[in-house]
Amino acid sequence: MVLARLIFQATIYPIWLDKTEASDISKLATQFGTLRLIDEAISGKLASYTSYEHLQLEALIAWFHHLQPKFENNLNENTSKSALSSEFCKVGACLLLTLPEDVFSVISHFLSPSDICDIIFCCKSLCALVDSEKTWLVQYEVVKVVKPLVGIWVQKNPVIGISYPLLDAG
């Protein structure tokens, strides 16, 4: 578990990656339920990005899905959303904030639209990254939904705070 915590610190990635075999990455991924994602990255499906970026992206997804239930289970009526957000994003935000927009848009096709929106709820400072046109274009391609339907979904969920210029343009 200590190793897992270290891996989630952005400064350890280059050192850890140089000394880690693909099989070890897969073992770690199994622990966090993201084996398929790691395997896809290692097999070169995202070949235009470096191994460092692959690992960073996969760790982000692992972090997101691993910690989310923990914090949801610990919620009570006295827990404020802002307290949850600051605790929830302590480690993961630094990973997301270091991602180039292009890289996040590629990896976002692994995430469901609700996961992407959950990232917005968890850390308002990440809104600009998640709200990028490229991220939602990837979702449009993956989900294969016509633009008007995506626009209706966005309009019916104003609390999410998503503005999607391509939808506004018609």
UniProtKB/Swiss-Prot annotation:
Residues 93-139 form the F-box domain. InterPro entries: At5g39450-like, F-box-like_dom_sf, F-box_dom. PROSITE patterns: FBOX. It comes from the Eukaryota. PANTHER family: F-BOX PROTEIN FAMILY-LIKE (PTHR31370), OS08G0105100 PROTEIN (PTHR31370:SF2). This is Putative F-box protein At5g39470. It comes from Arabidopsis thaliana.
